[in-house]
Amino acid sequence: MNIRNTLVLLVSTVLVLMSCSIGCYAGSPNCVGAPSGQVYIFSSWDFQGDRYVYNISQGQTTLPDSFIHNVQSFTSGSEICFASCNPLETYQISAGQSHRNYAALENFGQRMNLIIPGNCSNLVCPSN
């Protein structure tokens, strides 16, 4: 193989490899997007750290201890409701919605402890 053919092969290989990696980078919600019927909740910003997978078939669910008042980022594949019952506070989340830093400043990720499928009107707060 001559030098010209070697260079053409090398450049072609590099271009193919680059085209495979364009459009999706670590932490992109497009790369970690939850499929329909699921929500991915992360313990760190930018869709990093531990991940909790919620399926809408679970119904109203209290988050695992490590995620209560600690939802740092999320991506939703379904319409769901994030909630806190004491004091009562709810946020409706649409399918396809995501947030890279949900617990920053006054964001609700620092206060939520429940997740509900569908509309927030379905919330039933547990009695204390």
From Swiss-Prot:
Glycans are attached at residues 55, 119. GO terms for cellular component: extracellular region. Keywords: Glycoprotein, Secreted, Signal. It comes from the Eukaryota. Transmembrane segments: none annotated. Residues 1-26 form the signal peptide. It is found in: Secreted. Belongs to the Dictyostelium gerABC family. This is Spore germination protein 1/2/3-related protein.
